[in-house]
Amino acid sequence: MTASPDIDRLLALGPLKVWSVVVTIMGDLCRAPEDRIEGPLLTRLVEGMGINNQALRVALHRLKRDGWIEAERDGRVSSYALTPEGRARTEAVRPVIYAAAPPAPVPVSLVLPEPAMATQDFIDALPDDTVFPGTRSALTTGPLDPALSDALVTTLDTAALPDWIASVVISPEALADYTRLAQALESLGPAPGDLMTRTILRLIAFHHWRRMRLRHGTLPDLILGPNWPGAQARTAIARTLETYPRPALDALRAAATTPAS
């Protein structure tokens, strides 16, 4: 257990992959290309999430190897920044994970391939966020690959779909995760006065939202309506990010020099 019941409540939502937590931290706190996070500050942040220093070192090694971050050393202190590649990856998903509103409505299409088309070719021709009700049927949005020019394509009335479509668009387990996240965020107490604790709360909450949201595309929002659990979690995380605003790095560095309580 940590010193904060609210932190414990968020940690109970699921195990943390340390390398992914570091990506969340770097992406949320290092907004400018020149921004860096020193090792002692990063250690304080992850210790507040129950992550030990050995696990952090392994995660940093992996992220450097995979091109996410780079390190500089000043005396005995290392600092870390996103590489241009890491920043590009972060910026690519920023409109999705920070959006406070659902995506703009666009038509959803049911696509059936021509009989002569191989199933794998059909799958390969569709966008990554396509959902497959069956091996030779697809739900997708946007323009189609020319390879599908002979496919049967029909635009769906998303207000008149059968109930079973929900379990095709997103798994029941993911829906339950979103419900638990929204409930946990809505039960958080007043923002604590300690900047380090506030920041750790922000980062854990945002990390859980980020890992859930990046597992799927826009189809759940387009098909399941405005009150599905993911939409409720999005509203809750937007409110949480306002309650626990992003700190200035200099203020956070100063807070990190205060011994942990």
Predicted region positions:
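Short alpha-helical segments that sit at the start of domains
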Residues: T2-I25, A88
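Short acidic, hydrophobic short linear motifs in intrinsically disordered regions
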Residues: P33-L45
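Glycine-centered, phosphate/nucleic-acid-interacting loop/turn motifs that mediate DNA/RNA or nucleotide
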Residues: G67
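Short, Lys/Arg-rich nucleic-acid/phosphate-binding segment
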Residues: R73-S79
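Short, amphipathic alpha-helical interaction segments positioned at domain boundaries
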Residues: R87-S109
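Mid-protein regulatory/catalytic core that forms ligand/cofactor-binding pockets
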Residues: A116-T197
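C-terminal regulatory/effector modules of DNA-binding transcriptional regulators
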Residues: I170-S261
